[in-house]
A protein has these predicted regions:
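Internal anion-binding site segments
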Residues: 116-172
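Donor/substrate-binding cores of folate-linked one-carbon enzymes
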Residues: 2-120
């Protein structure tokens, strides 16, 4: 079985059906970016790169042994949409490579605990998270807006009780 961007947790029975053959493509650098909304958080956190990871699925959330991982640079010109496009094509490429490794019997398993004993989970974005905080630095506002631009909810602020949506900002 292959999973990609699936927002449900598979039951143990489902994971055991094809033993050690259920894999997931995760648009995050595991074990550091587990969970959801990874690309948003990578931008908000001003990361210089994001990862795509193909891993075995287990009962945890994005905790299985890593089969294949590739890192991609994040540029100031990037936003959520551009990272999403790169993640989709990157996941397709890495899944293909991982399946070939599995078929040939040469797939390696890297336990995530060897990289970092605990990992890190990204929280869900909630309603209200899209409101701009003007007390942040200009770099933080820049990262925030590009992290939640379309197809995300867009950054919101208010001026004289009028709502303003922001989809793009530049640091000058």
């Amino acid at each position: 079985f292959i999973s990609m961007s699936f927002n449900q947790i598979f039951r143990k029975r489902m994971l055991e059906y094809p033993p050690e053959k259920t894999i997931n493509c995760h648009a995050g650098k595991l074990p550091f970016y587990r969970g959801r909304n990874i690309l948003n958080w990578a931008l908000i956190n001003d990361e210089s790169e994001f990862g795509i990871t193909v891993h075995y699925m287990d009962e945890g959330i994005d905790t299985g042994d890593i089969i294949h991982q590739k890192l991609y640079p994040i540029f100031d010109e990037d936003d959520y949409f551009s990272l999403l496009e790169r993640a989709y094509s990157g996941c397709a490429e890495l899944l293909y490579q991982a399946v070939k490794l599995l078929q040939s019997g040469t797939a390696k398993r890297t336990p995530q605990q060897l990289i970092h004993p605990e990992g890190f989970y990204c929280s869900d974005r909630k309603e209200g998270d899209e409101i701009l905080d003007w007390n942040q630095s200009s770099r933080e506002v820049f990262n925030f807006v590009r992290a939640i631009c379309l197809p995300g909810p867009q950054a919101r602020t208010f001026l004289n009780k009028n709502e303003i949506l922001s989809n793009h900002v530049e640091c000058i």
